[in-house]
Amino acid sequence: EGRLVVTNNYDGAAGIGSAEGRNSGPINIYGGKLDITGGQYAAGIGAGKGTSDVATKINGGVFIYGGTVTATGGDSGAGIGGGAYNNSAKRSETDGVFIYGGTVTATGGELAAGVGGGGAYHSFWSNKSYNGGFGCRVDVYGGTLTAQGGRRGAGIGAGSFHSLSTASMGGTLNVYGGTVDATGGAYGAGIGGGCNGNGGTVNVSGGIVRAKGGTDAAGIGGGEDGNGGTVNVSGGTVRGEGTHYGAGIGGGERSTTRSKGGNVTITGGTVIAIAGGECKGRQATGGSAIGCGQGMSEKDKSNIAGTLSLADNYRV
């Protein structure tokens, strides 16, 4: 079995994928051992840094069929996915990440997701703020995926985002089989939003999914100051664990106007939701097991908990 080790020392260029301001076709990995690290502001596997003029994209997406793949993003770059960019209309992203087999470990750089969106950052040299944030489509059919977000990034989903008025979205995760373990960096959800990010959509019909949020974030759903998004479970086993003030499945801690619970529908499978516990030295009871993060009930009397729908024959 062959081995490929790539470390890109050029800012803005991915380890495997596109350079800054450039597009690439689909990336297909069938086997072997790969240890890939992206340059600063770029993904380990996926897109390089975006520019103000040109979107940077992996057209078609990243496909992994087997092998042992370890992907690490540079600062503000996802392990697998996108990098940073400075124009919301010209993003750095991939059309999707599709895993059919193998053992995949993806670690986001500072402010970025393990799998999904790159992270926001501020360049002191140019005095410009660069965005990241948005997750992508991730489909898991088999194999093992372990994803770790960088600080303020989700394990799977969105990286950190600068804007408090416009939240980043966690993208869409579809799990049909295999095993998924996702851990958010500080203030990022295990699966869903990074800091200031909403949860996106999670659909699970098979396999095993385990997700743990970083500080004040949901296991599955919103990062700190993020809404819960949509979660649909029809099969498999799902475990979501919030940290400190984050919900197990739902919203993160609220300090602005977000962190609502989102919409959760369970028609089959096994779901385990564990609320975040009290943060040492701070008075609170933590977030909901399924619902909103801590802080919403005191500040917002609207429909904060979201919805929970269960099939008629589903046993709680």
Task: Give the location of each predicted region.
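Helix-turn-helix-like N-terminal two-helix hairpins of bacterial/phage DNA-binding regulators
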Residues: G44, G77-G79, A113-G114, G155, ...
